[in-house]
Amino acid sequence: ELLSEINR
């Protein structure tokens, strides 16, 4: 979730 947002 957290990394998913950073990787956007």
Curated annotation (Swiss-Prot):
Where found, per UniProt?
Cytoplasm
Q: Which GO terms describe its cellular component?
A: cytoplasm
Q: Which cysteines are joined by disulfide bonds?
A: none
Keywords assigned by UniProt, alphabetized: Chaperone, Cytoplasm, Stress response
Q: How does this chain assemble? A: Homodimer.
Membership in a protein family:
Belongs to the heat shock protein 90 family.
Purpose: Putative molecular chaperone that may promote the maturation, structural maintenance and proper regulation of specific target proteins.
Q: What is this protein called?
A: Putative heat shock protein 2
